[in-house]
């Protein structure tokens, strides 16, 4: 989760 950016899954 990066500030609610879908481009960033919880990796």
UniProtKB/Swiss-Prot annotation:
InterPro entries in the cross-refs: Periviscerokinin
Domain of life: Eukaryota
Main location (coarse class): secreted
A GO biological process held by the record: neuropeptide signaling pathway
Entry keywords, A to Z: Amidation, Neuropeptide, Secreted
Function of the molecule: Mediates visceral muscle contractile activity (myotropic activity).
Protein name in UniProt: Periviscerokinin-2
Species of provenance: Chroicoptera sp. (strain Windhoek)
């Amino acid at each position: 989760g990066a500030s609610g950016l879908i481009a960033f899954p919880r990796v």
